[in-house]
Every structure is written in C-alpha cells, then in structure tokens.
C-alpha cells in the first residue's frame, strides 16, 4: 500500500497597489537595448553569472533570476532549471544573459552550442527564446559592450 500526499493550494487574485509592485516587474522589453539595461547588474562581477528574464505574452518581465554562477571563464547553465522556472511562472518567452569578466563579449564555441540547445528546448516546450545576450565591460576603456545572438542572427 502506497501513501500519496495531497496538497491543495488556493490563490487569491487582486489588483496590486503601485507601491507593492517591483519597478522591474512588468517592464516591457522591446529591443536589445532594453535587454542590455536589464542585465547591467551582472556586468562587473568577477565570475560569470548566467541570468534569465522570464516574460509574459506581452514581453513584460515576470521574473529575473540568476541561474548559474560559473568560474572566471565559463558558466554551465542548466537547461532543466531554466525551463522549470519558466513553466512555474507561466512565462511565454525568455531572454538569457551572461557576463564575460574578461571584457570581451564575443561568444565562445560553448556559448554558441548552448544557445542552439536552449532554442531547441524552448521550441519543444513552446517557450520562445528571444535572445541570449553576452555583456562585458572593457577593463581599459571602462565601456560596456554586448553581443546579441538575436541581433547577429544566431537564434
């Protein structure tokens, strides 16, 4: 005989007051520039951080989450974790971003391969991957630069 635990969750929906809503929540993403601004907080980290922005059907931010903290030269994000969160928050699409502490935003071979896997997994789950941004700050010029897979036709 097996015991099965059941749990009942009750949700109440109400309109949020303006002071209760995080400024990032429901911000609409309409361009790569909007996306880059969303990932600026990970630019100066000394280690690679892989972050995901989860969006509703109108491209408004539902959630932003750091998924993986890597070493100085690599992040190995987990597809399952990315999409588990997307399903849990009912995201229609996602935008991924990570930093390159080296100051060079050009994607590595691993970045390109991972992006292909990410898009393929999103297609299977009907969660669109809109972009994968690599952001970095040039240590000599102190300029922030980025690489957008969507802008470069890599999606």
Label every model-predicted segment:
Residues 1-16, 25, 58, 72-155:
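Active-site-proximal loop/helix of nucleotide/amide-processing enzymes and allied scaffolds
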């Amino acid at each position: 005989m097996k015991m099965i635990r059941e749990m009942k969750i009750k949700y109440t929906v109400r309109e949020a007051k303006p002071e209760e809503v995080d400024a990032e929540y429901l911000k609409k993403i309409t361009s790569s520039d909007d996306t880059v601004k969303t990932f600026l907080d990970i630019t100066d980290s000394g280690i690679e951080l892989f972050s995901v922005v989860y969006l509703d059907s109108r491209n408004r931010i539902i959630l932003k989450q750091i998924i993986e903290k890597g070493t100085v030269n690599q992040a190995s994000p987990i597809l399952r974790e990315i999409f588990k969160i997307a399903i849990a928050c009912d995201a229609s699409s996602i935008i991924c971003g990570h930093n390159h502490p080296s100051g060079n935003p050009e994607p590595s071979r691993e970045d390109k391969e991972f992006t292909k896997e990410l898009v393929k997994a999103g297609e299977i789950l009907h969660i669109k991957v809109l972009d994968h941004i690599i952001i970095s700050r040039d240590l000599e010029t102190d300029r922030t630069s980025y690489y957008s897979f969507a802008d470069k036709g890599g999606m």
